[in-house]
Amino acid sequence: MIAAAGVANRILGFVNAPTLLQKVVAKCIREKTDLTYYNRNRETLYEGLRQCGFSCIKPQGAFYLFVKSPIEDEKAFCEAAKRYNILLVPGSSFGCPGYVRIAYCVAYETIIGALPRFQELAKQYFQR
């Protein structure tokens, strides 16, 4: 019975947020977001991937970008990327088969550190 009440409470929480949460959101809604952080990450990752030979869709407002898989099986490409400690998500999970998705809402240093690994990954698929 207690478990059922807990589930009902969580479900109702989605319908009617707790008062404290409503007050916090009301204050945050007026706050400005500094987008320069995300813009720098987007530009660095986008340009870095293009220099490696990857074809990318430049996002206009998202915190992730889609990269064209260099092979037909984007899931196999995601697996290959893991060998370089790169985590990609198959685009088919988001209705974009043939692409992989990568988020850039991470520390700038993480993106800078990942670019050499993307270069190594690209060597498997592109002739220079």
Residue ranges and their predicted role:
Residues 1-128:
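PLP-dependent class I/II
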